[in-house]
């Protein structure tokens, strides 16, 4: 479930840590918002120090899609293809109705690892090029992938971890839209 934490107009880390309090979390997924980059090792509660910080792959895909469509950078297509193949694996697991334990095993398989190696190699290849040879959008997407590599691939550690938070964001989006409509109605 995606929950956006705001207090006095802030999405800061303190808002999230105050909300979590002493709860124990196995994992927490976010976008790459800077306030959450230290989740798992700097949260106030001692019992959250081992929390796995996951970063949503859908946010990464959107960055490469933007590089392809707005930046007109065809090199983004190669990385998008690899990410799409990771999603194809996840959809096949869903269709088969496998257990979280089986999903963990398959995510640790050569098939998944090969895709992650391929993704990393393409990332490193693109980053080795002079920045002038790519669009600013592709540079942003590459830097995001590089910076959050561990968090973006952490979903493979446990079959219970989602690859993204799309379902939760779609749910929250409906609530947010309804709230915005209600507020504008009362104005």
Sequence positions of predicted segments:
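Catalytic center-proximal scaffold of phosphoryl-transfer enzymes
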Residues: 1-187
